[in-house]
Amino acid sequence: MEKLTEKEKELIRVSWESLGKDKVPHGVIMFSRLFELEPALLNLFHYNTNCGTIQDCLSSPEFLDHVTKVMLVIDAAVSHLDNLHTLEDFLLNLGKKHQAVGVNTQSFAVVGESLLYMLQCSLGQGYTAPLRQAWLNMYTIVVAAMSRGWAKNGEHKTD
């Protein structure tokens, strides 16, 4: 598993400190962008028949619970920056779950773009090129583990 530099860890921790206190609104920004970039992903959220539009989905209690869980995964990664390898089994399992519900690995990249978009919107002037790169590096590590779990759960498909 790749490692982050001390400077990258510091940038991630400091930026997450303010965002992590109020996770759901930031997660909603991230998922709004995700559905903008890849509208077909909306079909994976079958919580109820009212999840036909992006806005319906984003305001659904079940979906907001999912947003909270995703933000908690990010929180766990930030909390374990010094030893991300300890999350390996958890992330492998998460990849398996995503494969089982029909998420393809290409969507992981779109989630990464959406995460960076949320950071840019939420941090404003605090969103710098080094900060972006630090988050991208962390996300790449997390997704690599999830992708290994995804591939272990079934035939490796890319579409």
UniProtKB/Swiss-Prot annotation:
Keywords associated with the record: Cytoplasm, Heme, Iron, Metal-binding, Mitochondrion, Oxidoreductase
Gene encoding the protein: ngb1
The protein's name in its UniProt record: Neuroglobin-1
Compartment(s) of residence: Cytoplasm, Cytosol; Mitochondrion matrix
GO molecular-function term, one example from the UniProt record: heme binding
Catalysed reactions listed for this entry: Fe(III)-heme b-[protein] + nitric oxide + H2O = Fe(II)-heme b-[protein] + nitrite + 2 H(+)
Annotated Globin domain residues: 3-151
Organism this protein belongs to: Oncorhynchus mykiss (Rainbow trout)
Subunit field text: Monomer. Homodimers and homotetramers. Mainly monomeric but also detected as part of homodimers and homotetramers.
